Amino acid sequence: MRASGILMPVFSLPGPFGIGTLGKEAFAFVDFLADAKQTYWQILPIGPTGYGDSPYQSFSAFAGNPYFIDYRLLADVGLLTADEVPAARPVGPIDYGALYNERPVILKKAADRLLAASSPAYKAFCKEQAFWLEDYALFMAVKAEQGQAGLADWPDDLRCRKPEAIAAAKQRLAGAVDYYKAVQFFFYTQWNALKTYANSHGIQLVGDIPIYVSPDSSDLWTHPELFQTDGAVHLTSVAGCPPDAFAADGQLWGNPLYDWPRHEAEDFRWWKQRIKHATSIYDVVRIDHFRGFESYYSIPAGNKTAAGGHWEKGPDRAFIDAIHKALGEGGIIAEDLGYLTPEVKAMLAASGYPGMKIMQFAFDSREPGNYLPYTYPRNSVVYTGTHDNVTAEGWRQSASAEDVAYACRYLRCAPEDLTEAMICACLSCVSDMAVIPLADWLHLDAEARINTPSTQGANWQWRLTQPLTPALSAHIAELTALYHRVPGEEL
């Protein structure tokens, strides 16, 4: 089925609380998507973030981000008073430090009221999500007690989950544990309401899960045996990418690597739980760095760059077969960008999952792969760019003159029309699914870039300040229909 969607992080939505939330602006964006005849809203990972603010480095593979909870919705159900809802602030780049200081104070008031009410819905949520919720809440409570220290710096008995230390922590931190569980109830109550609304308006949510967990996460703390660690929950090897034309030293991500033989011995139980959870909150799931299931780049822990790493074999088709058997064969997008061997391509083909194509890469002379539209298979998802790319307009302004000239010759357009031409090339190509970042529909420049890989600083901060007008939704709808991406209206 030919269809299209828009990439827009939740945190980039407008709104009065310093960050995009699951409140009325999210519902209004669903309305905009429906008016624009879109099928998909693609977001970035929604887990709780810490130092660096990256949604790809979360404290949990299962929890939701407390920053996305909308205060107004809590007030609507009596969990906050009108006076406790902060005054609206101008929409601008996200100040994560301010959120870090403000959010717990306000959410604690709502949590106390929820816990005092003995809510049956809350109790049911805790029971249903117990497989991750209890450990996550205890992890966050201990982390707070330790002054927000990373897991690697915790006292040995807590880091290694010595039974006596864990029992004492559960008793000592019972109130904090209840708070973190209540916050997750708030998040998922609001998330589920948004998903129900989106689905009722013909919009499917495309989620995103990183292949790796964070080194400072409840997942590593709870299941160290599933990762490449020593006996004291210290990492022995970490994840990253080898050097290439975009990064001379490679990318040192620092995430824990999986102990794949242990996962396979357990029939990939943890991964099945993770993907099952993802498919319960999203309609489609993008798995980041999918090639890592075939082989992964391993860097000795402690290395300062990724240059000294090497490739190791992953579970390959054994993983794919286990996921197919447990969860079926659809609903997943495989992020397959970067260095792809014949073995990776064979694994992707065996999975049946669509891979990704990036229109910007088609005209980037540094990119060794061929991303020109004539090479795309139908079973693929095409983007002008992703969160890791500069906007299309920003690319036009910053790419080499030769690359821009080549793109204009190929797309038969003037330089000032290149963004629209890239969008049309995506929509017109044979890929079953086309996803355009909202910033490209608005022709925004590099100021709207979401992330620059391997950099610290102003990442994950962009927010929408431009109005989403009826004229824009009509324009998007017109092109979507022109290229036969309106479900039910295909040729």
Enumerate the predicted regions with their spans.
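Catalytic domains of carbohydrate-active enzymes, especially glycoside hydrolases
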Residues: 24-49, 280-282
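Conserved, well-ordered alpha-helix/loop/beta-strand core segments that scaffold catalytic motifs
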Residues: 180-213
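N-terminal regions that are enriched for targeting/export leaders
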Residues: 1-11, 27
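Alpha-amylase-like alpha-glycosidases and glucanotransferases acting on alpha-linked glucans and related
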Residues: 9, 53-184, 188, 213-435, ...
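Terminal-tail/helix-coil boundary detector
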Residues: 462, 466-491
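Outer-envelope exported proteins of Gram-negative bacteria
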Residues: 44, 204-206, 210, 284, ...
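Short alpha-helical segments and helix-capping/turn motifs at coil-helix boundaries
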Residues: 24-31, 189-197, 271-273, 418-422
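Surface-exposed amphipathic alpha-helices with a cationic face
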Residues: 34, 191-199, 324, 348-349
